[in-house]
Amino acid sequence: MISGPNCLRVGQLAPDFSATAVYDQEFKTLKLSDLKNKYIVLFFYPLDFTFVCPTEITAFSDKYNAFSELNTEVLGVSVDSEYSHLAWLQTDRESGGLGDLSYPLVSDLKKEISAAYNVLNSDGVALRGLFIIDPKGIIQYSTINNLEFGRSVEETLRVLQAIQYVQSHPDEVCPANWKPGDKTMNPDPIKSKNYFAAA
């Protein structure tokens, strides 16, 4: 079951969904709106038992604590069934599997979630879409890769930190490549000169 607009843009409300997910070797019903008051990294990947996908999925799991410390939940989604997810989770990493993950994998067998987030390609699989959703359910960041190359977990974490910073410091903006501890700037023609003078 899914509800949401057909055309998604940053700044819009993320489409809600309810679907079966696999977490901790169990099937569970997951509803996006139940994660209110948290940031969400929602990423789509093409298919289970493939090649680039496990490198991304396990990389997000290995960095899960860093996301959790930022009040952020991570969700992976593909058009595979929950049974396929479970089988992949029960395959060790050395054999191309996932092993134990720190976050849920969502089954989008009917392809409704992928369609709502505009990541479904003509072959019926999801492109590598990634969305950062804030605690109010607003999409703050989105990116879509083609199938052949993976995403950077470190860059996702950096963007999340920048989003959280500007939301808690509404009079400041983050320049290119900003990381926590770096200088920010005031979006004002006069005050911004302080940043550029020190750059």
Curated annotation (Swiss-Prot):
It is an enzyme of class 1 (oxidoreductase). The keyword Plastid applies. Homodimer; disulfide-linked, upon oxidation. GO terms for biological process: cell redox homeostasis; cellular response to stress; hydrogen peroxide catabolic process; response to oxidative stress. GO terms for molecular function: thioredoxin peroxidase activity. Its main location: plastid. InterPro entries: AhpC/TSA (IPR000866), Peroxiredoxin (IPR050217), Peroxiredoxin_AhpC-typ (IPR024706), Peroxiredoxin_C (IPR019479), Thioredoxin-like_sf (IPR036249), Thioredoxin_domain (IPR013766). The lineage of its organism: Eukaryota, Rhodophyta, Bangiophyceae, Bangiales, Bangiaceae. It comes from the Eukaryota. It catalyses: a hydroperoxide + [thioredoxin]-dithiol = an alcohol + [thioredoxin]-disulfide + H2O. Its EC number is 1.11.1.24. This is Putative peroxiredoxin ycf42. One of its GO terms (cellular component) is chloroplast. It comes from Pyropia yezoensis. Thiol-specific peroxidase that catalyzes the reduction of hydrogen peroxide and organic hydroperoxides to water and alcohols, respectively. Plays a role in cell protection against oxidative stress by detoxifying peroxides. Residues 8-165 form the Thioredoxin domain. Belongs to the peroxiredoxin family. AhpC/Prx1 subfamily. It is found in: Plastid, Chloroplast. The active site is a conserved redox-active cysteine residue, the peroxidatic cysteine (C(P)), which makes the nucleophilic attack on the peroxide substrate. The peroxide oxidizes the C(P)-SH to cysteine sulfenic acid (C(P)-SOH), which then reacts with another cysteine residue, the resolving cysteine (C(R)), to form a disulfide bridge. The disulfide is subsequently reduced by an appropriate electron donor to complete the catalytic cycle. In this typical 2-Cys peroxiredoxin, C(R) is provided by the other dimeric subunit to form an intersubunit disulfide. PROSITE patterns: THIOREDOXIN_2. The active site is at C53. Keywords: Antioxidant, Chloroplast, Disulfide bond, Oxidoreductase, Peroxidase, Plastid, Redox-active center. The Cys-53-SH group is the primary site of oxidation by H(2)O(2), and the oxidized Cys-53 (probably Cys-SOH) rapidly reacts with Cys-174-SH of the other subunit to form an intermolecular disulfide. This disulfide is subsequently reduced by thioredoxin.
